[in-house]
């Protein structure tokens, strides 16, 4: 069975090259074709000996994805990507003034069961490999003809539910031989898997941490984010404090504002109270409507009122620029709509 070549770190590929009897520098050349030139056809590896190219073709898959469809709202572009086994994932290309970002998936489906998220529709199918995550970047760079400088692991799936592959993915794209994307330009978003936060605290690369909080108290969060029954807000905040003490990195708390659910002034005051004095940033996200879920975004005036409460409490906060509601840009919507995936 062929292996995906992008599942290999540089050191792993160098070892494979040496085992074939070739010189180690061939690994540098192969990585240059894969990551600097985004080549997906071994026949384009013109400086690689024919015999080694043949060996690569026999043993490896160079591209694990194909684009099924994409939609654009004039700025962001949402991609539906099919894997070799027929499963599908989504990625979003996001152009900003500071550079181009990509929001990638880490799993096919998700088992976190967040109430407002389309990724959970149909349940969890499988983890993505490191190479399947890398291929989201390579394919979208090839299509858009734009270099990606920022990576957010905030698509379908829970990154800390696939932590070993996620760390390997980061090692590959951060390496100078690979994509050479700076660690501080990579963000992991989690619903609050406490074990993962502690592991990230010890991880040698200074990637960013974002917590999908969405509620200021356990009673409400238990309903919106069922994983809260295992990892409470208190557990998450304790882990975040440890992460900050180890890394001195500011943590982002994502808060999806849902009309009539978690957008009251009382909720804003509660949120300000639990985050006060911490090295954090709050990202307010007016929720995208999801088919089959009765959630809608609050009026702009209420979003601004919520924002003002946090600002007056001394908390750093932004309202996320709304991208992609017309293209079903929230996690999992394009996949569930295209394949008519329903709740399990």
UniProtKB/Swiss-Prot annotation:
PROSITE patterns for this protein: RADICAL_SAM (PS51918)
A Pfam family cross-referenced in the UniProt record is Radical_SAM
Q: Report the record's disulfide bonds.
A: 103-331
One GO MF term attached to the UniProt entry: rRNA binding
Cofactor(s) this protein requires: [4Fe-4S] cluster
- Name the reaction it catalyses: adenosine(2503) in 23S rRNA + 2 reduced [2Fe-2S]-[ferredoxin] + 2 S-adenosyl-L-methionine = 2-methyladenosine(2503) in 23S rRNA + 5'-deoxyadenosine + L-methionine + 2 oxidized [2Fe-2S]-[ferredoxin] + S-adenosyl-L-homocysteine; adenosine(37) in tRNA + 2 reduced [2Fe-2S]-[ferredoxin] + 2 S-adenosyl-L-methionine = 2-methyladenosine(37) in tRNA + 5'-deoxyadenosine + L-methionine + 2 oxidized [2Fe-2S]-[ferredoxin] + S-adenosyl-L-homocysteine
GO biological process terms held by the UniProt record: rRNA base methylation; tRNA methylation
A cellular component term, taken from the record's GO annotations: cytoplasm
| Record keyword DNA-binding present | no
- First-level EC class: transferase
The lineage's top-level taxon is: Bacteria
Which InterPro entries does its entry note?
Aldolase_TIM (IPR013785), Methyltransferase_A (IPR040072), RlmN_N (IPR048641), RNA_MTrfase_RlmN (IPR027492), rRNA_lsu_MTrfase_RlmN/Cfr (IPR004383), rSAM (IPR007197)
Keywords, alphabetical: 4Fe-4S, Cytoplasm, Disulfide bond, Iron, Iron-sulfur, Metal-binding, Methyltransferase, rRNA processing, S-adenosyl-L-methionine, Transferase, tRNA processing
The annotation note on the cofactor reads: Binds 1 [4Fe-4S] cluster. The cluster is coordinated with 3 cysteines and an exchangeable S-adenosyl-L-methionine.
What the entry lists under SUPFAM superfamilies is as follows: Radical SAM enzymes (SSF102114)
Q: In this protein, which residues make up the domain named Radical SAM core?
A: 96-326
Give the principal location in a single coarse category: cytoplasm
Q: Any idea of its EC number?
A: 2.1.1.192
Residues bound to [4Fe-4S] cluster: 110, 114, 117
- List of residues binding S-adenosyl-L-methionine: 157-158, 189, 212-214, 288
Q: Where is the active site?
A: 90, 331
Q: Which family does it belong to?
A: Belongs to the radical SAM superfamily. RlmN family.
Main role?
Answer: Specifically methylates position 2 of adenine 2503 in 23S rRNA and position 2 of adenine 37 in tRNAs.
Q: Which HAMAP family match?
A: RNA_methyltr_RlmN
**Further remarks about this protein from its record:** Reaction proceeds by a ping-pong mechanism involving intermediate methylation of a conserved cysteine residue.
Protein name (record):
Probable dual-specificity RNA methyltransferase RlmN
This protein's species is: Caldicellulosiruptor saccharolyticus (strain ATCC 43494 / DSM 8903 / Tp8T 6331)
């Amino acid at each position: 069975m062929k292996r995906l070549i992008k599942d290999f770190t540089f050191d792993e590929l160098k070892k494979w090259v040496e085992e074939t009897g070739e010189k180690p520098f061939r690994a540098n050349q192969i990585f240059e074709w894969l990551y600097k030139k985004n080549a997906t056809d071994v026949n384009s590896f013109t400086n690689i000996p024919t015999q080694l190219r043949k060996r690569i073709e026999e043993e490896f898959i160079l591209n694990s994805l194909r684009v099924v469809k994409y939609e654009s709202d004039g700025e962001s572009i949402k991609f539906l990507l099919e894997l070799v086994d027929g499963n599908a994932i989504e990625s979003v290309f996001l152009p900003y003034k500071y550079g181009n970002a990509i929001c990638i998936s880490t799993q096919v489906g998700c088992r976190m069961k967040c109430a407002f998220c389309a990724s959970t529709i149909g349940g969890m199918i499988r983890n993505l490999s490191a190479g399947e995550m890398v291929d989201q970047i390579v394919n979208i760079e090839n299509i858009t003809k734009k270099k990606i400088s920022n990576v957010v692991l905030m698509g379908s799936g829970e990154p800390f539910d696939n932590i070993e592959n996620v760390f390997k993915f980061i090692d590959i794209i951060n390496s100078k031989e690979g994509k050479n994307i700076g660690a501080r330009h990579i963000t992991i978003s989690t619903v609050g898997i406490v074990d993962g936060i502690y592991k990230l605290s010890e991880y040698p690369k200074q990637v960013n941490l974002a917590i999908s909080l969405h509620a200021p108290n356990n009673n409400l969060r238990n309903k919106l984010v069922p994983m809260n029954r295992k990892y409470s807000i208190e557990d998450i905040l304790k882990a975040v404090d440890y992460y900050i003490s180890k890394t001195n990195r500011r943590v982002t708390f994502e808060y999806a504002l849902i009309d009539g659910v978690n957008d009251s002034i009382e909720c804003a005051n509660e949120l300000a109270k639990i985050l006060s004095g911490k090295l954090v940033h709050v990202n307010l996200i007016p929720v995208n409507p999801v088919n089959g879920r009765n959630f809608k975004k609050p009026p702009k005036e209420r979003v601004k009122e919520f924002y003002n409460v946090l600002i007056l409490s001394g908390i750093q906060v932004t309202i996320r620029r709304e991208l992609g509601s017309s293209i079903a840009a929230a996690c999992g919507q394009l996949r569930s709509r295209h394949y008519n995936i329903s709740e399990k």
